[in-house]
Amino acid sequence: MKKILCGLIVVGMISGCSDPILQNESEKPEPEKAFALVDVMSGNAVLEDWHENNVITRVIWQKLKLSEACGEKYPALLDAFEKYNEESLTEAKAQMYELTPLAKEMEGEEYNPVYCGAEAKLYLQRADNHIVSFFEGVETYTGGIHPDYVVNGRNYSPETGAEVKLTEVLTDTKDLPSILEKKITEKYPGVTFFELEDTFSKYKPEEFTWTADYQGITFWFSPYEIAAYAVGTLSAKIWFDEYPELFNKAYVEAPSDYVMTLPVGHEIEFDLEGDGVKDTIYTEKRLDQYGSYNMLSVTVNGKTGTDEINYAYDFDVYLVHMDDKNYIYSDSTSDNDYHMFCTWDINGDTPKITQELYGTEMDYHFVEEGYETGTVYKQAFNHPESFVLETRFDILGTRGATAAYQVSKTDGTPEMKDGVYTFNYGHEVTTSIPLEAELLPDMEKTELPVGTSLTPYQTDGKSYVDLKTKEEQIVRLAIDESDWPRKVNGIPEDECFENLMYAG
């Protein structure tokens, strides 16, 4: 069950629009501009075509949005995102028009009814007042041995909403072909390439695919672009500290702690310890032994850790840099939209899971965007000191509750800021016996008569639950959720309340 603010479909958020920053009318950001993060939201929209009770074509793409505060601060960026959404919808409809006839001609399999489709997925690399940068992977399947796959870089200026040009980030591009040729051949010594430097010299700056993070810019090359399809997507990173004279200083500025979304199935380069040694991180989905679910595998500098217990269908994966240490957060989606939020420690020899938060995911909101339509926008956080997680609880029924978190400086796990969860969805409850309670804030003893309607409000998740009465008073009940059935004041909860509803 999903909480509703008002409207349907999945997505992501960030933090930093509460404090004013100096506005600059110049197209190029100036180095002295105060640094601030930008609250970006992104997520999935879907079109489907059915034939004989089966989906035969599906197109998935992602929509972009700003938080309300950032939308007011960066109206041009908000307009750019809305334009992107409109263009993406138009493209999705065109793909459906092209793919559906192909799908109808194919002989499908009984247990694999989706014959043609396309999916575009965005991974936020950086979002601040200088640049908002996404890596985008687009996969299209029209039959045959393998799908087509291309990668894009989408880079926006928050102030103007315009595309950030490569020539705005680099002060000079004349040596770019030779730099890229050197980096690519050194990184992939066993690969046979097309004539790289000659190929790159024919590229105009705007023809390169690139993204920006807090340590440099990465150039991406789709399959077939500079090598055979089987080689896959290739990349080369030019580091800020490696070619300092090459970069506009405004884009070099970085916070000491940050988060970026990892593109699953792609290797990224990062200097994890700030020691000048370039590290590699690779995350991928691996099928379980039955081929039904996926397992997440994390490889850092050739050492691999795999979660072989918590199977899922999909994962959102984040690199967290905090106090010169590094962690990976994974938010997995499994059956019945059940989530698992895991912390991976990657500071040692082999990546390993150090914490599992069951039923927990990044916070989300359903925003109405038209008559009976809308999008679920999900936080794609980039601020280790401030983010929100939602946890599914089985307390007086199944319900979701959110809490504010920060990354622990001790072990890198999500750390609650105030120890309180606030419920955001779930049904009202009605007492079936008189119940002793405490009336907040003075903790006065009171008794709730039979037939009292209450709305669960807050909990610590283990010892108490606060509920609101029809008169907006808050009462506290003692709970014990260590076993089934849950107990209220030491009494089985189904004896205390009528018709408690739990998810199956």
Model-identified regions with their sequence ranges:
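Positively charged n-region of N-terminal signal peptides that target proteins for export
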Residues: 1-8
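C-terminal motif of bacterial Sec signal peptides marking the signal peptidase cleavage site
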Residues: 13-16
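Compositionally biased intrinsically disordered regions enriched in Thr/Gly
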Residues: 18-273, 282, 286-287, 293, ...
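Acidic, small-residue rich beta-repeat scaffolds with periodic aromatic anchors
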Residues: 30, 34-44, 212-265, 346-504
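Short, hydrophobic/aromatic-rich segments at coil-to-beta transitions
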Residues: 129-135, 324-329, 384-388
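Hydrophobic beta-strand positions in blades of beta-propellers and related beta-sheet-rich domains
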Residues: 153, 291-300, 341-343, 402-404
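Acidic, glycine-anchored loop motifs typical of Ca2+
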Residues: 270-280, 321-328, 385, 425
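A short beta-strand motif characteristic of beta-propeller blades
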Residues: 304-310
